[in-house]
């Protein structure tokens, strides 16, 4: 039993020898599968350019199907599809330009930012115009009485939960 060659494009295997491999790699099924694979990674601008240069496929327009599929010499896109594709190309172009035109942020470190923030907060007046409001905990409407709630849904006690000195988790 000899080695076997597996073609990822066609999802099939065959006996690996020079004749069989050449025959497969030059075969129509392999070439179609390879084209479909690489077409998945084409950008919208290249697809739009190709589709605009093609004439509409009559069979696809009449029946909605074409025997040639993605290998057809004619376009299977409607005018609306072409418009949507051109809008997508324009948006991608704008996004690339925006990234190039956007000013780069200066390299900074967290420590520098924290120092500036501390200085800003210390220089700010300590008395604020608005007093700090504390929020009052309220249970949602329609819940059962507090005594019937499980501990995980009850409000924390006023001062927080007491610390347990020797608690083991696990």
From Swiss-Prot:
One of its GO terms (cellular component) is U12-type spliceosomal complex. It comes from the Eukaryota. Gene3D superfamilies: Classic Zinc Finger (3.30.160.60), Zinc finger, CCCH-type (4.10.1000.10). InterPro entries: U1-CZ_Znf_C2H2, Znf_C2H2_sf, Znf_CCCH, Znf_CCCH_sf. SUPFAM superfamilies: beta-beta-alpha zinc fingers, CCCH zinc finger. Keywords: Metal-binding, mRNA processing, mRNA splicing, Nucleus, Spliceosome, Zinc, Zinc-finger. The gene is ZMAT5. Residues 150-170 are annotated as: Disordered. It comes from Homo sapiens. It holds the Pfam family zf-CCCH. This is Zinc finger matrin-type protein 5.
């Amino acid at each position: 039993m000899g080695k076997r060659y597996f073609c990822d494009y066609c999802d099939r295997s065959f006996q690996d020898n020079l004749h069989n491999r050449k025959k497969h790699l030059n075969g129509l099924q392999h070439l179609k599968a390879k084209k479909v694979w690489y077409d998945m990674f084409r950008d919208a601008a290249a697809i739009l350019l190709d589709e605009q240069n093609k004439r509409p496929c009559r069979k696809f327009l009449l029946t909605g199907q074409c025997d040639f599929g993605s290998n057809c010499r004619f376009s299977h896109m409607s005018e609306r599809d072409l418009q949507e594709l051109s809008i997508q190309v324009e948006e991608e172009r704008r996004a690339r330009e925006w990234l190039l035109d956007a000013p780069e942020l200066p390299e900074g470190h967290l420590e520098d930012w924290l120092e500036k923030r501390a200085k800003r907060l210390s220089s700010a007046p300590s008395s604020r115009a608005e007093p700090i409001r504390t929020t009052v905990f309220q249970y949602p409407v329609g819940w059962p009485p507090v005594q019937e709630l499980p501990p995980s849904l009850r409000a924390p006690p006023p001062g927080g939960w007491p610390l347990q000195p020797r608690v083991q988790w696990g």
